[in-house]
Structures are given as C-alpha cells and as structure tokens.
C-alpha cells in the first residue's frame, strides 16, 4: 500500500494541471473573501464612501452597514414611510408626521394593516425588510466591531468565510483532480505496478483513497497558511487578533469531512463502473444538491444545510455567520 500511496502522490505533484488547479483555488478564494479583509476601525468623522443606498436588507461592515437594533430599525422604517407618504401618496409633511405618530403606538402587524387599509399600501412590510441594515457613523461602526470582537477573534469570523469559499472551490478541484488520478489506472500503469510490487485489491484501493485524501489535505494546508498570513498582513493596522487555529478548526470541521466523502465516492464509482468518469456528473449533481436553498418551518427561504451534503456554506454577513442546521450531520 505504501508503494501505491507514494506513486499516486508523485503522479499528482508532477502534473502541471495540479498546480494550475491550486492557483485557481487560491485566486477564487481570495477574490471572494478579500473584501472582508478591508474591515477596519474608522477614525473620528471618517465615512465609507460608495454609491449604495443608506439602508439595505443586508450589508457588510466594510461597506459601512451595520444591523439595526429593533428600535433603530423601527426609526429608520418610519423615516422611509414618511418620505413615501409625502412623495407617492401626496400627504403634506404634517399629515405624514401624524401618520407616523399613530404607527409608533402600533406593533408591526397593526402598522402594516393600518397602511393597507388607509392607503391601500401593501409594500410597507418590504420597506421594513429593506431597513434591516443601515449605514452607521464611525462611532456606531466602531462600537459594533468592539461588540463582535469582544469574545471572538476577527479570524474566527473570517475563517468561516474562508471555509465557505475554500470548500466550494475545493469541491471543483477534487472532482477534476481525482478523475485525472483514477484515469491513470490504465492497463499500462496497472501492469507495471503488479509486476513490481505484490499488492492486494484492498491495499490498492486503500492506497488510492489515502493518496487522494492526502493531496487534498496538502492543498488545504497551503490555503490555511497562505490566508492566515494574508489576514495578518491586511489587518495589522486594525489591531485585530488573527489566529492560525481558527483557520485550522474551520477546515477540519467544515471541509475535511467533505474531501474524504468525495474521495470515497470516487473510489466506489471507479470500482463499480471500472471508470471514474461517471463520478464527475454525479458529484456535480451532488454539489448542486448540497448548495440548494430551501424553506424552513416559518416559510423563510435560505440556505439551511442538507443531510450528508458535501459543502457547508456560510452565506450571511461576516459577523453574523452561523453553522447551518444539520451541519453536524456532515
């Protein structure tokens, strides 16, 4: 088995396709996560300038957005409702203010019903959702960062985004590279192997599986070290705490099990069909299944995770990510 393991590792490392794949994974992950590395404390009076609206249904701190508290959320919504009443429904400023004063004494459901009944306006609830995040002042953004980083490191949050996109790109990488590896089992390769070392079928399969998993582990090691260094470089002026362990923990919890599953599936398919190529479309479909959104018990659509998925995604904002339900089943 050792001879098979060493041969497969050499076959990987000597192929230019392998290193091209590694570079593409690095580029993809960096391109997707580098904006989060621009997060920083703001100086007094500093503003994050962009052409985005002052409120949004979702937004990142590096864009200047912070989540609104229930009180702030309601305050921002009232301001937008007042503007809508004057600009669209033709109310005067004093009339719109009277409506706002009535809404302040109602809960959200009552406020929605009032606006629907009095003004035939059914979009007020969507205006409320669009006020979930707002552009904060420098003091508000800094206070939000202090709160989020009080008990956890910056790398704890960033490592989850790293695991999100590294897991996605590593699935593509593993699907292609493992197909190439298993395709090497031509008659010529097998003939040479069987006439140089005594080998059983079990040892041969274990050698292939362990080599495939080890090569994925090697790539993930490179990614962990590289992005840990990048995270330290980008955030050195912000004073954020960055730990290598956060990257390792996210990789072990959310990526390594998926790599082992992909290698095992490829091995099983290769044994059944005597060819690894049928595994490519099957694994791509498996990846699509793992990445599909869904509706929870409350009817809210989003990414909730699926049993035996080969990817764990963290689609929320940087400081609001949580492992999806059923991630423990992966």
Regions found by a protein language model. Name each.
Residues 3-4, 179-218:
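Helix-loop-helix units of permease transmembrane domains in multi-pass membrane transporters
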Residues 1-25:
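Aromatic- and glycine-rich beta-strand/loop motifs that create alpha-glucan
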Residues 5, 18-22, 248-253, 280-282, ...:
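Hydrophobic alpha-helical transmembrane segments
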Residues 72-131:
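Extracytoplasmic loops/domains of multi-pass membrane proteins
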Residues 35-80, 146-154, 277-330:
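Terminal transmembrane helical anchor/hairpin motif
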Residues 189-190, 264, 280:
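Transmembrane alpha-helix boundary/hinge residues in polytopic small-molecule transporters
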Residues 154-160, 185, 192-194, 301:
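Membrane-anchoring hydrophobic segments
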Residues 24-72, 113, 122-176, 206-276:
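Secretory targeting signals
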């Amino acid at each position: 088995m050792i001879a098979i393991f060493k041969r497969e590792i050499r076959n990987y490392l000597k192929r230019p396709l392998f290193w091209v794949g590694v570079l593409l994974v690095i580029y993809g992950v960096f391109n997707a996560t580098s904006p989060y590395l621009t997060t920083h404390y703001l100086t007094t009076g500093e503003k994050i300038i962009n052409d985005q609206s002052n409120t949004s249904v979702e937004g990142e701190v590096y864009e200047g957005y912070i989540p609104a508290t229930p009180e702030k959320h309601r305050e921002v919504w009232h301001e937008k409702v007042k503007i809508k009443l004057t600009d669209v429904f033709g109310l005067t400023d004093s009339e719109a203010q009277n409506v706002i004063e009535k809404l302040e004494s109602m809960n959200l459901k009552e406020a929605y019903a009032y606006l629907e009944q009095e003004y035939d306006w059914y979009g007020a609830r969507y205006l409320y959702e669009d006020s979930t995040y707002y552009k904060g002042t420098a003091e508000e953004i800094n206070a939000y960062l202090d709160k989020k980083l009080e008990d956890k490191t910056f790398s704890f949050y960033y490592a989850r985004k790293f695991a999100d996109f590294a897991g996605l790109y590593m699935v593509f990488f593993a699907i292609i590279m493992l197909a190439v590896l298993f395709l090497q089992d031509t008659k010529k390769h097998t003939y040479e192997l069987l006439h140089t070392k005594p080998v059983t079928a079990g040892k041969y399969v274990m050698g292939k599986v362990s080599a495939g998993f080890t090569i994925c582990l090697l790539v993930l090691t490179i990614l962990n070290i590289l992005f840990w260094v990048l995270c330290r470089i980008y955030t050195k002026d912000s004073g954020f705490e960055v730990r290598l362990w956060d990257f390792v923990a996210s990789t072990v919890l959310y990526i390594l099990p998926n790599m082992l599953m992909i290698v095992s599936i490829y091995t099983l398919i290769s044994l059944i069909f005597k060819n690894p190529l049928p595994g490519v479309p099957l694994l791509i479909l498996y990846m699509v299944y793992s990445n599909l959104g869904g509706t929870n018990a409350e009817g809210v659509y989003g990414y909730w995770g699926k049993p035996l998925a080969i990817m764990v995604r963290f689609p929320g904002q940087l400081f609001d990510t949580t492992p999806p339900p059923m991630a423990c089943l992966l």
